[in-house]
Amino acid sequence: MTLLIRPIFKVGEGSKGFLLRLAEANGLDIGVIDKLGIVFDIAVLNTLGYLPADFENTSLEKYAKSLENTLVVHGKSWNHKVPRFCPQCLQRDAYWRYEWELLFFDACHEHQVWLIDRCSECYQLLSWKRSSLMRCTCGADLRVQQAVRCPKAVVRLSKALSHQVFVTNNELPFYIVAPINLAQLQRFVRMLGTYGDSTVGLMPKRLKVNEELVNSWQLTSLAAEILDQWPKSFHMMLDSMQNRPG
């Protein structure tokens, strides 16, 4: 089904963010978009007119195909449960970046701040079911939320995650992750962040997977510091594990 207002998908935009932008433009709930069969699929978007007429052989086509492939191949690498964002990015351009939808992408590597997933007005987690891309369900403007500076190691981890989705000519922040793909890097982060915690025993009940920043920042902070000082910090982690209870 073709909707009346058809915003064009952008380079750098996230799949979930685009669908919410589409829903808002047409005064619909994002759940209605799903019921209408409008999903992030290049063939579907092209047929419905959500891609430019001169789409082929453009940077947008290359980006859209790479994103679609990553969504299919690494479906579990995405955090589509709890939205998160950088207010400074939204102030500049009103669209949802694809990186914000990645699991363990906790910081904006451009502005070097922690992302936000909880409204400072109502203190509730953001929801994809909100009616406006730029506002919380309570009506608060996301662009004026205050972000907090984050450690430089976490910034570099975010760059590494971004690089694993779309390989660039830029040098990887951590040489150790060069041979692995996105899903493998995220599992590595989860492992380092879990076992790097000195309060965790040798056999934790389960490796944490949590889409909320209040929990994931602890994993990414520990993992980023270990990767940033590799292999010294990794050896220190192993030494620490020898002295922990089983």
Where are these regions (language model features)?
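Basic, alpha-helical nucleic-acid-binding regions used in initiation and control of genome expression
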Residues: M1-G246
